[in-house]
Amino acid sequence: MSLEDAFDEPAFVPYLAAGDPDFESSLAYVEALARGGADVIELGLPFSEPIAEGPTIQQAVVRSLEGGMTPERFFEFVETLDVDVPLVCMTYYNLIYQYGPAGSQPVVPFVERAAEVGLKGFVVPDLPAEEAGPLREACDEYGLDLVFIVAPTTAGDRLERMMEQVSGYVYVQARLGVTGAREDVSDRTAETLARLEAYDVPKAVGFGISSGEQAEAVVAAGADGVIVGSALVDIVAEGHENGDAPDVVADRLESLARELKSGAVAGKQRQPGPERT
């Protein structure tokens, strides 16, 4: 299934850092999200300087790195997963650029390896559209998508450059600032979605969604899906701190996943329909 096909109905797109808090537990957690109704799963390949992340995901990155996660280990993780949903790698450009044997062409070895293990695309928060040419070309060569993050403040000319290169879906930032679960949904979300109506690519809203009610409201505002990270990572962190068994944590993740997916689907029923004459 392609990334765009995953948005045939309102999509639930969860994020977890691969390897948090350890390889085996993380496998179970990702598979629990798939059982809970995930349509696409974003897997974080940890980088030592995660500039786009809030404290919750920063700590997940630390746990993953301390557990031995590396790019090659990440690819092994993807190969080991038993899920039937598209997987997207969320990481930082330095890891993509530096991967591969000495003297190899930058970017291409990482994208080639990603295609080999079955990944469907990338989200690269620190890569401006103006500098994305090499990665876009490699993705085209190996059949992968490149997702960009659009903020409420993204200027029109920069938005145009993003939308010329984006594929799969657009990651719409619901709030300004770094990621993290919030108590409400920004009023600017609908405004940002309205700016994107002219572009024929699914729009998935993230940065702060933590409940089924929020997921419903975001889809009702016109989104094609919701992206949820911090609320799920919080469950992993709490389970790790309390010493809970992985299957217990997995059950909690699956339960929240079902709530979020149900909320997204319910939101579709609230979207304005075509005007009747």
Swiss-Prot record:
Transmembrane segments: none annotated. GO terms for molecular function: tryptophan synthase activity. Pfam families: Trp_syntA. InterPro entries: Aldolase_TIM (IPR013785), RibuloseP-bd_barrel (IPR011060), Trp_synthase_alpha_AS (IPR018204), Trp_synthase_suA (IPR002028). SUPFAM superfamilies: Ribulose-phoshate binding barrel (SSF51366). Disulfide bonds: none annotated. The active site is at E42, E53. It catalyses: (1S,2R)-1-C-(indol-3-yl)glycerol 3-phosphate + L-serine = D-glyceraldehyde 3-phosphate + L-tryptophan + H2O. One of its GO terms (cellular component) is cytosol. Keywords: Amino-acid biosynthesis, Aromatic amino acid biosynthesis, Lyase, Tryptophan biosynthesis. Its EC number is 4.2.1.20. The keyword Aminoacyl-tRNA synthetase does not apply. Pathway: Amino-acid biosynthesis; L-tryptophan biosynthesis; L-tryptophan from chorismate: step 5/5. It is an enzyme of class 4 (lyase). Tetramer of two alpha and two beta chains. Belongs to the TrpA family. PANTHER family: TRYPTOPHAN SYNTHASE ALPHA CHAIN, CHLOROPLASTIC (PTHR43406:SF1), TRYPTOPHAN SYNTHASE, ALPHA CHAIN (PTHR43406). The alpha subunit is responsible for the aldol cleavage of indoleglycerol phosphate to indole and glyceraldehyde 3-phosphate. This is Tryptophan synthase alpha chain. It comes from Natronomonas pharaonis (strain ATCC 35678 / DSM 2160 / CIP 103997 / JCM 8858 / NBRC 14720 / NCIMB 2260 / Gabara). The lineage of its organism: Archaea, Methanobacteriati, Methanobacteriota, Stenosarchaea group, Halobacteria.
